[in-house]
């Protein structure tokens, strides 16, 4: 079943519902009503708005006023052809699907997005961890004689020792470092949470660089951001996600690491990976990462074990005749 979509005009276009002409539905009214109905954070609302505008622009440039399920499948294929990652494609399709679900529920329109799946996600992670050697080189490369170096060292050191997400570090305030039972804890607002009700433990090696940085900043007020901008325009303000990513990317590039798979988020992967290599149990690593599902943590363990116990080495040993390096061997080979 097809129907005339809202079009891409501020005045709106007539909408057909089961062959009957309904009232005009202006684009901005529909978008605003849909977005306001979503019980999500402001950043998610903005993502929904951008995603829908992208879809509606795609319809407009093709002169499509009667989209069908095939239209959405074609849109999905177009996203693939444009080289978007499976993660990005899925995000766009989820937004379109939510919008048509809402239109069905609130306007009685046929849901042409029902059953449309996102792109098949690759197994594993989209970012790689740093090696222990790279971590040491990265930290040693930072000149801490000036404030920028003190901040960047404290920040990167915090990431690789605690597994914080970038947004968690950005949201942190000076007052969020508190003592409990003789230990320093950093209370954080975790992913998808409204309060700072999770924490990471700050060892002496993690805490000392932070205090050195804060002292050099002039002992900021408790409610001040833990890590602040040093730009002329926004000096003292909270770092943005973009700025933080740029800082870390720049530090990585300074030691010759320039890969799309090694970014700010890699530091979180690094901490979780190092914890397992250091002997942490799966449950301990899950607590560090604050993974809701232990299966996510198991991916890290699987990757470590897969490399450590790689059967490719046994094949090499067999072909080269070094059978003494192989355990049980089938003598009929």
Task: Locate predicted features.
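Conserved catalytic core of the tyrosine transesterase superfamily
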Residues: 2-333
